[in-house]
Amino acid sequence: MKVCPECGAVYDGHHWVTEPDKELLRKLAKSKKEKELCPGCLRIERQQVEGVVTLKGAFIDSHLEEVENLVRRVAKNGWHQNVAARIFEIKREGDGLVIETTDEHLAERIGKEVEKAFKGDLEFKWQKKDRFVRVSWQRE
């Protein structure tokens, strides 16, 4: 069995689990544990960004905390489904936020959830060759 030293995810021999059940915890307690970075932590270490979400407009200034909380919640839910899907960085730029993710589908989900919660204009630009997406959302 393998355990990620950064986030605590457990590899059960088939896939990485972020919240091991009692049975897996029992197996983990009895077995020899190897330390290995999970796919998400490995992508962060390699600075492997597969999605960039740009949220712009006056709405961000007046609802910054709400928007950031939603983004973090979407990322946390995504992590439970896919251990490789993480937020690499959230930074404030001008009248908006830029969120870099380690998974293109997480970036897409963040954009869709922000648009669903706060309306606005949403656009996706997928790169054909690479696994990469630019998500733009704006609301004044």
Protein language model features and the residues they cover:
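N-terminal cysteine/histidine-rich coordination modules
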Residues: M1-R46
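Long C-terminal interaction/binding lobes of large macromolecular proteins
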Residues: V3, V10, R72-W79, A84, ...
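Residues in flexible loops and secondary-structure boundaries
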Residues: H15, E19, D61-H63, V98, ...
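A generic "cationic amphipathic patch" detector
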Residues: V17-P20, G51-T54, K112
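Short amphipathic alpha-helical patches
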Residues: K27-L28, D61, K91-G94, R134-Q138
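Short coil/turn motifs at beta-sheet boundaries
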Residues: S31, R46, R92, K128-D130
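Extended interfacial segments that mediate partner engagement and assembly in macromolecular machines
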Residues: I44-L106
